[in-house]
A protein has these predicted regions:
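Positively charged, proline/Ser/Thr-rich regional signature most characteristic
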Residues: 1-56
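Short glycine-/polar-rich loops that comprise or flank the Walker A/P-loop
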Residues: 2-4, 115, 209-213
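Catalytic cysteine-centered active loop of the rhodanese-like fold, especially the PTP/DSP P-loop
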Residues: 36-96
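Phosphate-binding P-loop
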Residues: 61-64, 109-116
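Glycine-rich phosphate-binding P-loop
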Residues: 76-80, 118-137
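A short glycine-rich beta-strand->turn/loop micro-motif centered on a GG-aromatic cluster
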Residues: 87-104, 144-149
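Conserved nucleotide-sensing/catalytic segment adjacent to the nucleotide-binding pocket
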Residues: 137-207
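Conserved NTP phosphate-binding and transfer environment spanning the P-loop NTPase/kinase superfamily
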Residues: 208-214, 218-315
Length: 315
């Protein structure tokens, strides 16, 4: 679960021992053995918990009332025993009934709810991510799928990003953000393929994206080149060249050679031009069959508050 702290009660060997005792000698003896292991770790566990509590207490954004939310796999003895222990220390534990299993059901169910999704689409370099950030800044409901996936979606998408979350974590993060929204209001997302790097967009959510209203951002080639240069010229040459080589079969030998040499010589406009045609063709292919598209020309426009009125006019 997002922002949770993992405090294992048992390691793999201990779990195996407890499981074996449970099968051969029954639940009672397995519980006793588990308590022996737990007793040896109680001090360390409490230290970790109190460190987290101290960190929260010094947070200026804290709520007045403090509860410790505890969960385990199915809401059984592990979470219940920790809750009992915390009660002895006059703390306020809350256990998640049904545990993480129930939480995951809630996560997956949340993607099936009917949502008013608005997809921001456009060719590479039209500033879709910056536009989404602008909408977020002005309190529009937005889901930053690339931000949550720690990947921009292209062969260059992992540059400068943190390690990608697991697909399960990715789904949990999206669901937690959706929980804050009114589904009857517009929810803005950037157009994506089904996979963002190694993260897969939840199937039900992606289906809603495919059938949603779309705003296609139009910008001049000059604007798009500037956008790409500002985004990618800051990275190491070796990283950029590795990214180009991953799509060399699609670029072809001539464009691959131009891109690699241009990176080496820091001719960023040539680098971007050499890959732009490839990504434009990919975009046109993905656009086939899409309907309900409104065009929004932002050529030479500053991405500031003045754009919001233009967006509202095309909705």
């Amino acid at each position: 679960m997002p922002n949770s702290i993992n405090i294992p009660l048992f390691d793999n060997d201990e779990r195996s021992i407890i499981g074996t005792i449970y099968k051969k000698e029954g639940r009672k003896k397995a519980v006793i053995e588990g308590l022996k292991f737990f007793e040896n770790k109680m001090e360390l566990l409490l230290d970790n918990l109190f460190m987290s509590i101290d960190s929260y207490e010094t947070n200026p954004k804290k709520n007045n009332e403090f509860f410790i939310k505890i969960y385990c796999s199915r809401g059984g003895m592990r979470s219940q025993s920790i809750a009992w222990l915390l009660e002895k220390y006059k703390l306020n534990p809350i256990t998640l009934k049904g545990g993480y299993k129930i939480y995951r059901k809630w996560v997956l169910d949340s993607f099936s709810k009917k949502m008013n999704i608005v997809v921001i689409s456009g060719k590479t370099g039209t500033g879709k991510t910056r536009l989404l950030s602008l909408l977020e800044k002005y309190k529009y409901q937005t889901i930053d799928l690339e931000g949550f996936a720690c990947h921009r979606g292209s062969t260059f998408g992992g540059l400068g990003m943190k390690k990608q979350p697991s697909n399960e974590q990715f789904e949990n993060i999206i669901a937690e953000k959706l929980k804050l929204f009114k589904c009857s209001n517009d929810i803005f997302v950037e157009a994506e393929s089904a996979n963002i790097g190694k993260c897969k967009i939840p199937h039900e959510f992606f289906n809603q994206m495919k059938n949603s209203r779309r705003i296609e951002i139009l910008r001049s080639e000059s604007n798009r080149l500037d956008e790409l240069i500002n985004t990618y010229s800051v990275f190491k040459k070796e990283e950029l060249q590795e990214s180009v080589l991953r799509i060399k079969k699609r670029l072809g030998p001539q464009r691959t050679k131009i891109a690699l040499e241009s990176i080496n010589n820091e001719k960023w406009d040539l680098v971007c031009r050499s890959v732009l045609d490839y990504y434009d063709k990919c975009y046109e292919f993905e656009k086939v069959g899409k309907t309900n598209i409104k065009l929004l020309d932002l050529t030479d426009k500053k991405y500031d508050e003045s754009i919001l009125e233009l967006i509202n006019n095309v909705l």
